[in-house]
Regions:
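Conserved active-site-proximal phosphate/metal-binding subdomains
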Residues: 1-7, 12-153
Length: 153
């Protein structure tokens, strides 16, 4: 046991993925890519639309063998850096150009493979309400199945 909450992150975008994390012992979840593509996110709409329009294959890993490793939108700049296996220079002006200016080639737009499961920019309240309702439904179904003996440890 840990005396601090364990927060699961990576690959969590909806109720079923939230339920999976909780079933594995997480105390909570972080839905990074899902929250970037929310109506309230201050991130530029170009980035949000790259998530909505992208598939799970539209991301690349930069700094795979360096730190910090990052999964990002597969811009031409990111693909070239991944292919060269060169460390990425984190330029704050370039990042600001991506985050708030919408220049998807300027910096790196961090995005997980779960972007392939995001089909709209929605209000956070709607995302969380639906995710929590779906999570509870999945956990109830698993609890019923375990009680009936149709699944076992």
């Amino acid at each position: 046991r840990f005396d601090v909450p364990i927060i699961a992150a990576g690959g969590i975008v909806d109720g079923p993925s939230m339920a999976a994390a909780l079933a594995m012992g997480a105390d909570g979840v972080q839905m990074g890519t899902r929250m970037v593509a929310s109506a309230e996110s201050p991130i530029h709409d170009n980035w949000k639309q790259s998530i909505v329009n992208g598939s799970e294959a539209d991301t690349v890993m930069v700094n795979r063998h360096h730190r910090p490793a990052m999964r990002v939108f597969a811009s031409d700049k990111a693909k070239a850096l991944e292919a060269a296996n060169e460390p990425a220079a984190l330029d704050i002006d370039a990042m600001m150009g991506t985050y708030f200016g919408g220049d998807m080639e300027s910096g790196f737009a961090m995005s997980g493979q779960v972007q392939g499961r995001i089909d709209a920019v929605r209000p956070v309240a709607d995302v969380l309400r639906e995710a929590w309702d779906d999570c509870q439904s999945v956990l109830r179904t698993l609890g019923t199945a375990a009680a009936e003996g149709s699944i076992s440890a």
